[in-house]
Design a protein with these regions (language model features):
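Bacterial Sec-dependent N-terminal signal peptides
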Residues: 1-6, 11-34
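Generic marker of residues within folded, mature protein domains
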Residues: 7, 46, 104-106, 213-215
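Short beta-strand element of the conserved SAM-dependent methyltransferase core
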Residues: 17, 114-118, 238-243
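Intrinsically disordered, flexible peripheral segments
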Residues: 34-38, 47-66, 122-123, 131-245
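Phosphate/adenylate-binding glycine loop and adjacent helical scaffold
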Residues: 43
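Histidine-centered catalytic micro-motifs
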Residues: 106-126
């Protein structure tokens, strides 16, 4: 009987390890056309199935063909199922601003808004209620030194870090924004100039963290840019498990 129990325990352990191994690896979403190139989302999971990196990859053909004139444009990147089940994130929207945007003299450079949304595409489209656009979360759910900017319908209210270099006399190159709607954090947004993406092959920064999270899950603590093999990766990294408070 003892040998049988040991055999069963061994089989269960091997099955458990195989199950975790099946969850490990890098999983990609579908390709999307971005100007004359491509973009796609992806997630890297560790051996325990926990997220290690969540990102998007843009080809050099896309970066080199972004129009210098014309209107703003946006491309949606669906996340792979493994990303939606292992992180709070639902999809990514890549916004191109050929002339930048307000405030003048700060964010008026050609740049990308990389929205990592924690709500569905339908919820983003329905984010038009003025009261909900203007409703601020409790201070503990945003990082210190983050202050609200004007709300944008079908996005949300953008909170910016007052200690960021571009708000203290330095040129804008990259920054990290928190977005909210109905008093809840609904997106993370690395905002990065085209020039910075083209000129930096390896960049890493920390993501300011709030004291509390409304939804439990794995959240990133770093943002990275990496260029390799004719593509550029924009990566949320350093995921940490947070409890809801």
């Amino acid at each position: 009987m003892k040998k049988v129990l040991i055999l069963v325990a061994t089989v269960n352990l091997l099955f458990s390890c195989k199950k975790n191994d099946d969850n490990a690896g890098t999983f990609s979403g579908p390709d999307a056309t971005i100007q004359q190139g491509k973009g796609k989302s992806w997630i890297k999971l560790g051996a325990n199935g926990a997220p290690e990196q969540l990102g998007l990859t843009i080809t050099d053909e896309a970066l080199n063909s972004m129009p210098a004139n014309g209107d703003e444009s946006e491309v949606k990147l669906p996340l792979p199922a493994m990303a939606k089940s292992s992180t709070p994130f639902d999809h990514i929207e890549v916004g191109w601003n050929p002339h930048g945007h307000e405030p003048a003299g700060i964010y008026d450079k050609p740049h990308f808004d990389f929205h990592f949304y924690m709500v569905s595409e339908g919820e983003v489209a329905a984010a038009t209620n003025t009261a909900k656009l203007n409703a601020n979360p409790a201070a503990d759910y945003l990082p210190q030194n983050y202050v609200p900017g004007p709300p944008v319908p079908q996005m949300g209210k953008h909170f910016i870090d007052v200690t960021s270099p571009e708000l203290n006399g330095q040129p804008f190159s990259q920054t990290f924004i928190y977005g909210t709607y109905d008093a809840k954090v609904t997106f993370f947004e690395p905002m990065i100039t085209l020039a910075f993406l083209k000129s930096n092959s390896n960049f890493e920064r920390t993501i300011p963290q709030p004291a509390k999270f409304k939804k439990a899950g794995y959240y990133p603590t770093k943002m990275r840019i990496a260029k390799h093999d004719g593509v550029t990766d924009i990566v949320l990294d350093g995921f940490v498990l947070r409890q809801a408070i």
